[in-house]
Structure formats: structure tokens, C-alpha cells
A protein has these predicted regions:
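Generic C-terminus detector
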Residues: 369-409
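Structural beta-sheet core signal
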Residues: 70, 123-125, 161, 250, ...
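Short helix-loop-beta junction
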Residues: 86-96, 145, 267-278, 347-351
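Glycine-rich phosphate/diphosphate-binding loops that line cofactor/substrate pockets in enzymes
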Residues: 53-66, 111-121, 236-246, 297-302
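Active-site phosphate/pyrophosphate-binding segments
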Residues: 150-306, 395-409
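Glycine-rich phosphate-binding loops that contact phosphosugars or nucleotide phosphates
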Residues: 59-225, 405
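Helicase-primase coupling helices
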Residues: 282-364
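Extended, charge-enriched "interface" segments that sit outside catalytic cores
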Residues: 1-59, 323-327, 343
Length: 409
């Protein structure tokens, strides 16, 4: 059952002239005719031994620690963090998942070490090459700290490496030290890695049902109706871009979707921001950010359109007590939040702001699998419509090289 629905009535943009080209590209995607498109059919192709291996390793890690530190940056950790936050964190009795290697702040890492000092810890380092600066620094610091805490032999038993199957400095170290390892498939780029071991292994440790997560993606990957929904969203995004919109503001009225927004920013920013093109992805938590950005959204320079992620059903709620006053007492807080969605959209429609609403039926593993796959597909199609390669990110090497120059590398 498809649990992602899209409403384009508010976009008020015609895009039928691009339909045929987008359909042709989607057909190429489904036939895996482009480089780095292994992610398209991957949910149906994941080897059963990989799934079993991740589950066994997750059981082992759970028996050893109460904190699993995921070391990675960008797509190497954001998928894990986004899914876990949306689900409310680790399941009872499972280790808390913490994140390092996503910045180069000495203060952050020093403080991080103090936070976990008295905990039982395992590491999961996610890096295809092992050479990414942020991850390399954090891994070296935390590994040395674990040597002092556990000794070298025991530390090796507490490290899981997700990396290239044959090459790279992390693969060499993992082979030498005897770490448990999982592969990052060579034809899947990091920004499309939501269903690879780098994301799914930490989720398994946290008690997430990774089979159900993958099944959500697997069902819609083979569903023509789903691909049409993705096509509609991609075409609408491109048409709004062509009409002069420069920013897509991703909005959600549930704070648990904050990291889904961050994941989208990385996905869209690196897929589309090339050759002077692309939509700039921003994200807002509403109603919170209405008290800082609401004025701009309503009456500011209209270089943006809005995409609203709306969770229809949540499994927890609060009834407003009598003390709140007769106009609110007895109401469901989730119902009031739903009225806020409608009210804000009505106000923004009067201001002629283009809006796209994506309804997410409920927030569980199955639906999240559908949502992440849906967003990856629309990013690929929109990028292709813009005339850029949606599967590379050459510009990120420029700043990395400048940093290496300053470090004398």
C-alpha cells in the first residue's frame, strides 16, 4: 500500500511540456541504464545474506554496549539519524545511537568524549574511502580513546566498518585489524545510500525493523502509480524553478521530521547545485519557525515555493485540559496542529505562494522506506530536467583541496 500522497493543486504551474522527457528518463532509471543508479532496484536486490549478517552483527553490538557511535558525514549518517528521529529514537533495551565525524570542532569532540566516558561503547565507521577528513579525524581520536579504555584487541571487536569492498585506507585497516565489515555497493552514491549497510546496520542496532524499512521502498519501486507521483513532484519542482523560484522551503509541523529536512537538504543540494543551476533547499519547523520566518513567508521577496511534509496520523497525542480555556479545552493537540497546517496554507495561498503538500499517512519503518525512496527518485529526475548530472558532486572537491593546501597535504 502506498502511504505517500502528493497534492499539487496549490502549485499553479503547468508542466506538461516536460512530461515525455521526464518519463523517458524514469524508464532509463528503472532499467539501470545510467552510472551510479544501482540504488533504483537495490531494495529488491539486497542479498539475504547481507540482511542476515547485519542482524547478527547488530545482536553482537547490542550485547556489548549501551552507546553506538556512528562516525560519518553527509549521507553516511544523515539517513540513520533522520529515520531514528522520526521513529522516536532507539527501541527500549537497545543502545542509544550517537554521531561523530560530522564536523571538525575540537570542542565538540572533547565534550563528546566526556559524555560517553562512563558508557560501554562500540563504533560504526562509515566511509567508502576512509579518507574523508571529518570522519578520519573523529575515528582516530575515538579509536585511541577506546584503546585506553579497552585495549587494542577488545577495541577491534567493538568496531564495525562500512566501506569499499576492496580498496581504500579504511578497508586496509579493517582487514588488518579484523573489524566486522559491510560493503558500500560501488554503483550507489552516498546521497542515494538510504538502503545500504551504512544506514541500515546502525538502524538494526537501534532495534528498527530493517526488513520492513526495505519492504516499504521495495513495494513502491515496482509500482507504476508511485512513479507517477514522483514524476508529478519532480515536474512541479522543475516548473517552479523555471518560473523563477530559487528556493524550495521544506516545511514540517512535527519536530521529529527535522532531520528528514536536513537529509533532503543534502540530497537536493548536492544533486542539483551545479553549473550555476539548482534550487536552494531550506527547511523550517512549523509552527516554531513561523515566529521567526512567518512574516517573510507571507510578505517577503517571493523567490521561493513551499513543500509541506504533513504526517496524517501519529500514535501519540495529548488532550488539552480545561485550564487552557473553553475555546481549546478538550481538543486533541494533533487536531489543532492539523488546523494550523490548513490555516497557514490558506494564508499563503492568498499571498499567491506556490505550495506542494506531501501527505505521509503514518510514521513507521514501512512508510519511511517509501518516503526516502520517493525523495531520492524525485531528486534524480529533477536534476535531469535541469540538464545536470544528478549523480555526482564535483564542486565539493574545491573546498576540500583548499583545506588540504592549508594543512600542507
Amino acid at each position: 500500500m502506498i502511504k505517500i500522497n502528493i497534492s499539487l493543486e496549490e502549485s499553479r504551474v503547468k508542466y506538461s511540456d516536460r512530461h515525455d522527457g521526464a518519463v523517458a528518463f524514469m524508464q532509463q532509471l528503472r532499467r539501470d541504464e545510467e552510472d551510479f543508479t544501482g540504488w533504483v532496484n537495490w531494495p529488491s536486490e539486497i542479498p539475504s545474506e547481507w540482511m542476515d549478517g547485519m542482524k547478527r552483527a547488530a545482536d553482537d553490538v547490542r550485547s556489548k554496549c549501551d552507546k553506538l557511535i556512528v562516525i560519518g558525514i553527509g549521507g553516511s549518517y544523515l539517513g540513520t539519524a533522520a529515520v531514528l528521529e522520526a521513529l522516536g529514537g532507539s527501541k527500549p533495551g537497545c543502545p542509544e545511537i550517537l554521531y561523530a565525524g560530522n564536523n571538525m570542532s575540537g570542542y565538540y569532540l572533547a565534550d563528546f568524549k566526556e559524555v560517553v566516558e562512563n558508557n560501554e561503547v562500540c563504533l560504526c565507521v562509515v566511509s567508502k574511502s576512509g579518507g574523508t577528513m571529518e570522519s578520519r579525524l573523529a575515528f582516530s581520536v575515538l579509536k585511541d580513546w577506546m584503546y585506553e579504555k579497552y585495549g587494542r584487541e577488545e577495541t577491534a571487536k567493538r568496531i564495525v566498518a562500512v566501506t569499499d569492498p576492496v580498496k581504500g585506507i579504511l578497508r586496509e585497516e579493517a582487514n588488518h585489524e579484523g573489524y566486522v565489515t559491510f560493503e558500500i555497493p560501488g554503483n550507489i552514491g552516498g546521497r542515494y545510500s538510504a538502503f545500504t549497510p551504512g544506514i541500515m546496520f546502525p538502524l538494526a542496532v537501534a532495534g528498527v525493523d530493517i526488513e520492513t524499512f526495505v519492504n516499504g521502498a521495495k513495494e513502491i519501486a515496482s509500482d507504476d502509480a508511485f512513479w507517477q507521483k514522483g514524476l508529478d513532484y519532480a515536474l512541479a519542482r522543475f516548473a517552479l524553478y523555471e518560473s523563477g523560484k530559487e528556493i524550495e522551503v521544506i516545511e514540517y509541523y512535527d519536530p521529529s521530521l527535522r532531520l528528514i529536512g536536513e537529509w533532503c537538504k543534502q540530497l537536493y543540494g548536492e544533486r542539483e547545485g551545479k553549473e550555476g543551476k539548482g534550487l536552494f533547499p531550506a527547511s523550517l519547523t512549523l509552527s516554531t519557525d513561523l515566529h521567526s520566518m512567518g512574516q517573510f513567508l507571507q510578505e517577503g521577496h517571493q523567490i521561493f515555493f513551499e513543500t509541506i511534509f504533513n504526517v496524517v496520523n501519529r500514535d501519540k497525542d495529548v488532550t488539552v485540559p480545561e485550564s487552557a480555556g473553553p475555546d481549546l479545552a478538550g481538543r486533541s493537540l494533533n487536531d489543532i496542529n492539523a488546523m494550523a497546517v490548513k490555516g497557514v496554507m490558506a494564508a499563503h495561498a492568498k499571498a499567491n505562494i506556490p505550495m506542494i503538500k506531501i501527505d505521509i499517512e503514518e510514521m513507521d519503518e514501512y512508510t519511511l522506506g517509501q518516503l526516502l525512496y520517493f525523495l531520492m527518485m524525485t531528486a534524480a529526475v529533477t536534476g535531469k530536467l535541469m540538464g545536470i548530472d544528478p549523480f555526482n558532486q564535483p564542486g565539493v572537491e574545491d573546498y576540500k583541496q583548499e583545506i588540504r593546501n592549508l594543512l600542507g597535504q
